[in-house]
């Protein structure tokens, strides 16, 4: 594999409250609704197979060195990053170089941020078996799916995969102009690209519409236990069950900053 997801960055307004929520969601820690001000600009959620970064949104319009986005974005570790940078430079594609992180950040045609770093400088992900959660996918909402897909194929040199529907397929449009995948394995893990589907939640009787705004997805080992904890703490969620990917039970919910989050489990 010539690429992997190195980090997921989720924008939040209250760092302490958000950290507590994600530790409850992914690490089985107690849920404390108390809002305590945080003094730092970012934090990381541990016990997973990638870096999960929460970063505090601020008014930094005057500082073009600070990446601010209301959408979750991914950091991709790629082979031959220098060749990729040369190619996008030749094509006149703008990017921001972060010397501290040894990375660049650009926008694909759907205007989602993507951070790129060198695969050779990043340590291998920890063993999946030892984690309380694992990364599954990042969903990017794009106005023109094929334009965004072609950009990633051409400049990032990642091969497009094929979406495999489950027998229990819900009311989901999986045509290539609506939904595409760059998969890391046969489990639909990787990058999902979709066009906003305004009637998606209405057709499927969902509280949440995961096609709008994009979302990160994480896998856990006992989704029914999480559902019981969500109910106990009065946290609303959509139980989609198996409906879009084979043998994957999915649920959706909002975090304290109104980011849609997906939690799933292979069954």
Named regions from a protein language model:
Residues 1, 4-13, 34, 43-48, 62-134, 139-140, ...:
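Vicinal oxygen chelate
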Residues 1-2, 10-52, 141-190:
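Core segments of cupin and vicinal oxygen chelate
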Residues 18-21, 84-88, 148-151, 226-230:
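Hydrophobic side chains in well-ordered alpha-helices
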Residues 32, 59-64, 122-126, 168-170, ...:
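A short, acidic/glycine-rich surface segment
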Residues 33-36, 63-68, 99-102, 163-166, ...:
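Short, tandemly repeated low-complexity microdomains enriched for cysteine and small residues
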Residues 50-53, 111-114, 189, 201, ...:
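Short, charged/polar, Gly/Pro-enriched secondary-structure boundary elements
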Residues 147, 153-243:
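Structured core of small recognition/catalytic domains
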């Amino acid at each position: 594999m010539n690429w992997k997801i190195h980090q997921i960055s989720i924008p939040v307004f209250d760092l302490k409250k958000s950290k507590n929520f994600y530790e409850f969601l992914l690490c089985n820690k107690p849920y404390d609704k108390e809002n305590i001000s945080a003094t730092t600009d970012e934090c990381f959620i541990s016990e997973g197979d990638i870096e999960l970064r929460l970063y505090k949104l601020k008014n930094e319009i005057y500082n073009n060195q600070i990446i601010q986005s209301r959408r979750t974005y991914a950091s991709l570790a790629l082979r031959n990053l220098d060749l990729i940078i040369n190619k996008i430079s030749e094509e006149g594609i703008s990017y921001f170089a972060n010397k501290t992180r040894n990375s660049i950040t650009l926008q694909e045609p759907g205007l989602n941020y993507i951070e790129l770093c060198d695969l050779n400088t990043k340590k291998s992900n920890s063993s999946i078996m030892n984690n309380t959660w694992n990364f599954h996918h990042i969903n990017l909402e794009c106005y023109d799916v094929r334009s965004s897909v072609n950009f990633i194929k051409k400049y990032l040199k990642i091969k497009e995969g094929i979406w495999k529907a489950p027998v229990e397929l819900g009311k989901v449009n999986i045509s290539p102009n609506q939904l595409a995948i760059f998969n890391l394995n046969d489990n639909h893990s990787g990058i999902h690209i979709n066009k906003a589907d305004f009637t998606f939640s209405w057709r499927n009787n969902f509280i949440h519409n995961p096609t709008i705004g994009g979302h990160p997805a994480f896998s856990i080992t006992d989704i029914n236990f999480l559902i019981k904890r969500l109910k106990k703490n009065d946290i609303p969620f959509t139980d989609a069950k198996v409906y879009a990917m084979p043998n994957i039970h999915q649920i959706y919910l909002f975090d304290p900053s109104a980011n849609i989050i997906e939690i799933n489990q292979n069954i």
